[in-house]
Amino acid sequence: MSQDFDYDLVIIGAGVGGHGAALHAVKCGLKTAIIEAKDMGGTCVNRGCIPSKALLAASGRVREMSDQDHLQQLGIQINGVTFTREAIAAHANDLVSKIQSDLTNSLTRLKVDTIRGWGKVSGPQEVTVIGDNETRILKAKEIMLCPGSVPFVPPGIEIDHKTVFTSDEAVKLETLPQWIAIIGSGYIGLEFSDVYTALGCEVTMIEALPDLMPGFDPEIAKIAERVLIKSRDIETYTGVFATKIKAGSPVEIELTDAKTKEVIDTLEVDACLVATGRIPATKNLGLETVGVETDRRGFIEVNDQMQVIKDGKPVPHLWAVGDATGKMMLAHAASGQGVVAVENICGRKTEVDYRAIPAAAFTHPEISYVGLTEAQAKELGEKEGFVVSTAKTYFKGNSKALAEKETDGIAKVVYRQDTGELLGAHIIGIHASDLIQEAAQAIADRKSVRELAFHVHAHPTLSEVLDEAYKRAV
């Protein structure tokens, strides 16, 4: 490192993306600092992935042990199940503390300098850190922006963080309302509906688009609606906006038809979770000091090497990863982007393969996917001149699923008819989040279903649902 610089790399934001980048940078021999103004670990560790999975694990056990029909099929009888909200909430909070501590310690152990305060770009290769007691200026050969995202709250919604709240508050599980409305049917809304119904709450789900779960493959969404929504007596509204939400007791929700814009109903519920997506936290980053502007939604434009783009060209020595780029708002995607950015900083040209990054909803049963949906693949096929085919298998034909008495589910693979290249995989079923990685690796390696059909899977395992899907594709 030149004496003109304090660090080879300064990272703004110690979420999963920044943390992953910092660890890889140190392994590559870069003197690295990471700046964080709030909680180490960012959204994932403190208000997202980690606490929500703890809640899902606990509530999932309650659901499983409360399902007398399922238990009797296995020859098990339990005389009632009890739980305490406070203990489940404490489990989530304790896990957050542990992961946050582990993350911080890993940075210290590898000699990454952790600097507390608000970090912002103050010029080319320069970062200003505004702390409680001092302001520092750091010179860095490379700067990486990892500011993350925050929940999006549409206009007309009054948030009081008690009766009307976002996922930031929901993960604390401070109350179990008798009746809760959830605005949005994406993975956040789905996961919290899973938690709340398992713990005895009545749920109403409101979706602005015509169909529930619009981000999932339609066949998967149809099964999910049957298994995760209808079987749990969740009331649903589709094609409807929650145009006004007034916090209080009760919470008042005005519903408006998305097409006609007419008010169609008013709900009075005990609480409301607003799960309408997330927006980038890109304000006050000092981007203007290097002539960079965010797009109209606030995202930082980057290329697949994670270089910040201005007027179609990379900005020297400036990188961005994670939710703030708008590419794929997932913690593991951010971590992968961070590693790719560091590789490029070190002169090893690398690009992010977004098609091979999997995603999952940790409902009961789980949903996972990687690559293209059937519709997306067909659209690509029309452009590039190839035909798309699909193959499906059902968990009800899988020996391990039958042994578990967990037979709701399907695995669907999407592939090119000419070359057999796997383009996408979509699963709903027990342990779907674990099963999808096999397909993700196959997509990353551009494998053909004709090759995959000859791979031997252990028997009896759930992984055979993909094995059977590959074989049906040949």
Curated annotation (Swiss-Prot):
Look up the record and give one Gene Ontology term from the biological process aspect: pyruvate metabolic process
Q: Which cofactor does it need?
A: FAD
Q: What does this protein do?
A: Lipoamide dehydrogenase is a component of the alpha-ketoacid dehydrogenase complexes.
Q: What is the lineage of its organism?
A: Bacteria, Bacillati, Cyanobacteriota, Cyanophyceae, Synechococcales
- What is the species of this protein? Synechocystis sp. (strain ATCC 27184 / PCC 6803 / Kazusa)
**How does the annotation summarize its subunit structure?**
Homodimer.
Please name the gene that encodes this protein: lpdA
* Cofactor stoichiometry and binding remark: Binds 1 FAD per subunit.
**Record's PANTHER family?**
DIHYDROLIPOYL DEHYDROGENASE, MITOCHONDRIAL, DISULFIDE OXIDOREDUCTASE
Q: Does the UniProt entry include the keyword Phosphoprotein?
A: no
- Listed name of the protein: Dihydrolipoyl dehydrogenase
Q: Which residues form the active site?
A: 459 (proton acceptor)
Give each disulfide bond as a residue pair: 44-49
